[in-house]
Amino acid sequence: MKLVEIAEDILSKANAYTNNTGLTSSQRFQLREEIRYQANGILSAIDGPEQTMKAIARSYTTCTALKVCVDLKLASHLPLSDARSLSQLAQICGCDSLVLRPMLRLLAKNGIFEQVDAETWQHTELSAVMAQPPFQALEEKYRSVAHLPRLLQAVSHQFPTPGRTAFNQVYCTSLDFYTYSNELDHAAARNFAFSMKELARNQIPFVQQSYPLETIDPESHFIDVAGGVGYLSFFLAGSFPKATFEVQDHPFIIEEAHSVCPSELRDRITFRAHNILHPQPEIAKEINGRLVFLVKIILHDHGDDDCRLMLRNLVSVMKQGDRILIIDTVIPETGGSLSSANSDIIIMSMFGSGHRTLEEFRALIHRCGEDLVIETFASGDEEYDGMMVIEVRKAEPVLDN
């Protein structure tokens, strides 16, 4: 397709996307992906395939410039509503202006920071995002992904295994990221935990749209497995005013969780230090409601063996009527979002695991050695990056005639 034809097609789709006339969430997602794909097609049409491939191959330089500016906390040192000279920024950041200048020049080509004149720089909408918590949790991901090609060469391009990942080599440890950060790098653990707030907030509409929450006993006891500081439980507590919650995670994160729990929820939410690979603690005798185990964005960070162990630990304490709600990305057999494709590489680098298809999830759950019933809920899956809610229950006993 010629350049003008691509541009005209994008304009037509952009108008449909902006006007949102009668589009379902799935159609909006598909339209967005087509616009993004064709926008890249414009660059290819302008530069030609050889130059386009060179630009893609050199994109690691943009990541490097971004990482340097994150290390310097540049986004925080530059006021959102004002501009600063290069020399001022270099002095505030404690770096050489000759180091900072090429970083800013390259990022500005991507809309990250803006050069006002020969000496002065200011924020853009993109660069302002760098001051937010999720961007403070990129250190381990950046270093691990950068090391992945070398690791794969060393293992003859076989899939990495837990304990022998790019993260493990970079940080000279056999511990997984969560154990390592909670035991040895509390700043990393804290940054990661607090970066999950917006993710949890954005997932609540998806859960409400996709899963019939009204089928849950209003006096249920929710157990938020590896739940970080408890953001998902905080949000769900508003929908279940009679329910109780227990948030489980590593000891350091649980200490942090106490400080951020809303005061009005402290009589209904408890926190427990617990390793998800260990058997579930005994349920308190005063807990009479149905159990609902929340497993949100957990399984994709673990290999099949560990996932089966986690699920068996949950199933072993379940009774009829209890349920597990797995909230995770489920990749399609073809296609899928750019976001999930990116995170698949990150997960391989960090954990030696990856996203799963629905059939892979089903096989994983059924190999837990129990007679389990699986239902999937995904009415908004494409809009929410392929997310699904997978409900797991014990099968009803078959009565003899």
Swiss-Prot record:
Record carries keyword Methyltransferase: yes
GO biological process: methylation; secondary metabolite biosynthetic process
Transmembrane feature ranges: none
InterPro entries per record: COMT-like, O_MeTrfase_dom, Plant_O-MeTrfase_dimerisation, SAM-dependent_MTases_sf, WH-like_DNA-bd_sf, WH_DNA-bd_sf
A UniProt-annotated Pfam family: Methyltransf_2
Alphabetically ordered keywords of this record: Methyltransferase, S-adenosyl-L-methionine, Transferase
EC number per UniProt: 2.1.1.-
Active site, UniProt feature: H300
Gene Ontology terms for molecular function: O-methyltransferase activity; protein dimerization activity
Pathway: Mycotoxin biosynthesis
Enzyme class: transferase
UniProt binding sites for S-adenosyl-L-methionine: D249
Function: O-methyltransferase; part of the satratoxin SC3 cluster involved in the biosynthesis of satratoxins, trichothecene mycotoxins that are associated with human food poisonings. Satratoxins are suggested to be made by products of multiple gene clusters (SC1, SC2 and SC3) that encode 21 proteins in all, including polyketide synthases, acetyltransferases, and other enzymes expected to modify the trichothecene skeleton. SC1 encodes 10 proteins, SAT1 to SAT10.
PANTHER family reported for this sequence: O-METHYLTRANSFERASE ASQN-RELATED, PUTATIVE (AFU_ORTHOLOGUE AFUA_4G14580)-RELATED
Other comments on record: Trichothecenes are sesquiterpenoid toxins that act by inhibiting protein biosynthesis.
Protein family per UniProt: Belongs to the class I-like SAM-binding methyltransferase superfamily. Cation-independent O-methyltransferase family.
Name this polypeptide is given: O-methyltransferase SAT18
